[in-house]
A protein has these predicted regions:
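Membrane-embedded, hydrophobic transmembrane alpha-helices
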Residues: 1-108
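Loop-to-helix entry region of an early transmembrane alpha helix in multi-pass inner-membrane enzymes
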Residues: 3-4, 66, 176, 180-184, ...
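Residue-level signal for transmembrane alpha-helical positions in Major Facilitator Superfamily
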Residues: 13, 43, 177, 205-212
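Transmembrane-helix motifs of polytopic, lipid-linked glycan transferases
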Residues: 17-18, 72-80, 197-221
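Transmembrane alpha-helix boundary and packing residues in multipass membrane permease domains
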Residues: 19, 49, 151, 183, ...
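Transmembrane signal-anchor helices characteristic of membrane glycosylation enzymes that use polyprenol
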Residues: 73-79, 116-142
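Loop-to-transmembrane boundary segments
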Residues: 103-123
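Extracytoplasmic catalytic/substrate-binding loops of multi-pass membrane glycan-assembly enzymes
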Residues: 138-152, 158-185, 193-197
């Protein structure tokens, strides 16, 4: 339970940092704001993972503290040279509020206008919510997950970094040279807890991307 609480705190804290940094960019579109915040959040959690992984000191404790410090640094940088800290906090809160309302407004407006976009939104959000729930309930049995995705995650945790894995000289060597951003995002969700959330990032990022793109089709008022 403590592991899940720590994961929740660090994940939310990193997203708050990303959202505050995105607020400084002042996008006119809420969809763009959401996508940018998700990308920055991903960067914030991947930066310490890659740095610690290359150094061979990727432990739960080092990652937790590194992530906290990086998120704090991003939050601090977001407040740099603002006219009023209180005013910027209100602006950040408004940004979070607007982004949170985006999917609900998209559904409401598309329904009121009897738009086919409503059907698409409901279908996409339902499928992605279902797959996120199933990712938690059932282990992955897809060929690529067992082949190299989860292999890379497991060995990175076991070896406390990106040490070369001693695998047969066949296609399993992909686990030694494949790009790691997706896998290390998955590592973020399991290193503090267990493997139940290893496939969750796929659904989370897909929800943000699909919601932003579909919502942008409804009306400029939603974005």
């Amino acid at each position: 339970m403590l592991g899940f609480l720590l994961l929740t705190f660090l994940t939310v804290y990193a997203f708050v940092a990303a959202l505050l940094a995105t607020t400084r960019l002042r996008y006119g579109s809420r969809a763009e704001t959401l996508l940018t915040a998700c990308l920055l959040w991903n960067f914030i959690i991947l930066l310490p993972i890659h740095a610690l992984g290359v150094a061979g000191v990727l432990y739960r404790s080092t990652l937790g503290w590194s992530s906290f410090l990086i998120s704090s640094a991003v939050i601090g940088a977001s407040f740099a040279r603002v006219d009023s800290w209180e005013g910027f906090l209100r602006e950040g809160w408004q940004t979070a509020h607007d982004v949170a309302r985006l999917p609900f407004e998209a559904l409401t407006i598309s329904f009121q206008r009897r738009s086919l976009v409503f059907v698409g939104l409901v279908a996409v959000l339902s499928v992605l919510s279902w797959t996120a729930w199933m990712a938690y309930l059932a282990p992955s049995d897809a060929w690529d997950g067992i082949w190299y995705h989860e292999t890379m995650i497991g060995y990175a945790i076991q070896n406390h970094g990106y040490a070369t894995m001693h695998l047969p000289m066949n296609l399993t060597q992909q686990a030694n040279g494949y790009p790691r951003n997706c896998e290390m995002t998955g590592l973020w969700f399991v290193i503090f807890t267990d493997r139940r959330l290893v496939e969750l990032p796929n659904s989370l990022m897909a929800v943000a991307t699909a919601d932003s793109h579909c919502s942008g089709l409804v009306t400029s008022r939603c974005t």
